[in-house]
């Protein structure tokens, strides 16, 4: 599988996400995140997840090495400069649009598919309104993953699968 530059924020299943094409994983410590990590624990988790990412890349025969970031808050995440063709955030809010519709709108507007996608997937129960507002202020469009609320692991894999299917030729 080619490198799909999609960055999944908050995925507990790095191997599955990376084998589905994520170039990077940036775990987000949202207000509704159950597990709280101190700096030492966060660094330890990051090292463990990076090892899993390397093993997943080897298993999948990828010719690029995915990167796993240290867990951070959403505010910290957006302080770092990033550039994506399309920025999305999973949301349970009523104005969220289906992922396939947003991809179709992007292609119609730009005459091509996006080559880099930021996909933020939140904790069960969704991001807080303040976190959604922050993401929107940084250009993220809210998407729905359907009528069923998915676990984080399932939502991440779902998003990567749809992006892979829709964007890779």
Placement of each model-derived feature along the sequence:
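Short, solvent-exposed amphipathic alpha-helical segments in soluble enzyme
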Residues: 4-9, 17-20, 104-110, 134-138
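A short acidic, often aromatic-flanked loop/helix-cap motif at beta-alpha or helix-coil junctions
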Residues: 72-78, 95-97, 150
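Glycine- and other small-residue-rich loops at beta-strand/loop junctions that grip anionic moieties
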Residues: 66, 124, 148, 152
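Structured adenosyl-cofactor binding patch, chiefly the S-adenosyl-L-methionine
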Residues: 129-169
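Active-site/ligand-binding-proximal alpha/beta "capping" segment
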Residues: 82-132, 141-144
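Short, glycine/charged-enriched secondary-structure capping and boundary segments
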Residues: 40-42, 102-105, 133-135, 158
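RNA substrate-binding interface of SAM-dependent RNA methyltransferases
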Residues: 1-89
């Amino acid at each position: 599988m080619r490198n799909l530059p999609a960055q999944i924020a908050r995925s507990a299943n790095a191997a599955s996400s990376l084998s589905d094409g994520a170039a990077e994983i940036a775990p987000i410590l949202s207000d509704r995140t159950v597990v709280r990590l101190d700096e030492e624990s966060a660094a330890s988790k990051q090292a463990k997840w990076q090892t899993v990412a390397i093993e997943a890349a080897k298993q999948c025969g990828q010719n690029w090495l995915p990167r796993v970031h240290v867990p951070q808050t959403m505010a910290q995440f957006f302080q770092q400069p990033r550039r994506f063709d399309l920025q999305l955030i999973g949301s349970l809010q009523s104005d969220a649009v289906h992922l396939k519709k947003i991809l179709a709108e992007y292609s119609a507007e730009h005459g091509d598919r996006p080559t880099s996608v930021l996909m933020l997937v939140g904790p069960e129960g969704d991001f807080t309104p303040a976190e959604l507002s922050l993401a929107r202020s940084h250009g993220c469009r809210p998407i729905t993953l359907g009528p069923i609320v998915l676990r984080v692991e399932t939502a991440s894999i779902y998003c990567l699968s749809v992006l892979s299917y829709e964007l890779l030729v």
